Amino acid sequence: GHTLRLSTQIAKADCKSSGAFFMTEAGVAEELPTEPIGYLKVVTLGESTLSAEELTSIAGNLANGAVIDLGEATFATTEFPMDFTRKTNLQEIALPRNIQTFTPSTYNSGAFYGCENLTRVTFPEGLTAIGQNCFRNCAKLESIELPSSVRTLDIYAFYGCKLLTSVVIPEGVEAIPRFLFDSCTALTDVTLPSTLKSIGAEAFEATGLEEITIPESVTTIESSVFKNCKSLERIQFPDALTAIPANLCNACSALTTINMPSKLETVGNDAFYNCGKLQDVTFPETLKSLDERSFGGCSAFTRIIIDIPAIANYAFWNCANVTSIDLGEKVTSIGRNAFISASNLQTITCRAENAPSLGNSAFGSAGSKVEGAKILYVPAASYDTYETAWTDVTSQGYALQDINDQQLTDGIYYRA
């Protein structure tokens, strides 16, 4: 979109095999312009390089909406410095062709940290790492195309890039670090590589993701990765995943579908808290524990079948549309408010011969909206035990019945 008016000095440049040339809208020169730069293309020939001092001068002399093209220049080192930090006049930049990494940064700095009007960046093939805070709070950055050579991404690299819509992470990358795309609210599409092994905490928190497939190679996912992703509807977990961490999908209000990995052992606190559209899930036999509020507020659940020793406090709090709960033989304790506010709960099945201990209000307000019969199915030989230990349940109108006479949903009775 820029018109380059080449003066007679271009002939001089054409005859040289080395040197640095600065092309502006006014023509070609061998010295940097002194007036504020609206457009600048730097070309280096032979063994000549763009010096660190020259780059500093360019960064300090930008006009509003500046476009800087260094794609045909060789920089003095392979490490790009932090001269453009908070340069709000910068609109577009192409990095020098030999850049491999960025200068290490601190919490409040980065190569393009706070370049609020940067809309486009072009990376060279050969770039291997994108550093901490590199493009943090580049609120107008619309797209990035990471070279296939990239292997390392650092924390906060694209934090707060609010207009970024899609990203393809190159094959060879093994770790998504913490906060990488946190608060990229327009980010709807991410492709993860088959080489990926871990995803750091809050990496995609508050993004616009609509669905995500996590590669089978991933064995570690940290907390809050998809927290507050209000548009996220589907997640495909790797089947070998053994732990779903705390707050993973907390407040993902559009989430409807997840798969429970076949080797899953633990689900952390608040992992799916207030996922109000999440449909019924099937827990694998390998499951050992659910932490507090792990499925609290999953109001679209209609049925819960679970068989673990301890059901944590508030684990299924306010699952208001659940009509049946089936507790397996392993269950020994049910925590405080674990199933509180299950107001449409019609049947509870508990297969343990010894009545599990109940925390305060474990089934508080259960079945409060049920107009017909409410039944507590238990082993016939354990009636006395449940009558004594589960008075908080029977006092809410649940009648004890033999588990062997439990009625199927189609109205047919079966013998267990």
What feature does the model see in each segment?
Residues 15-86, 96, 106, 113, ...:
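Surface-exposed repetitive/solenoidal architectures
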Residues 40-49, 64-77, 88-103, 115-129, ...:
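Structural signature of tandem-repeat unit edges
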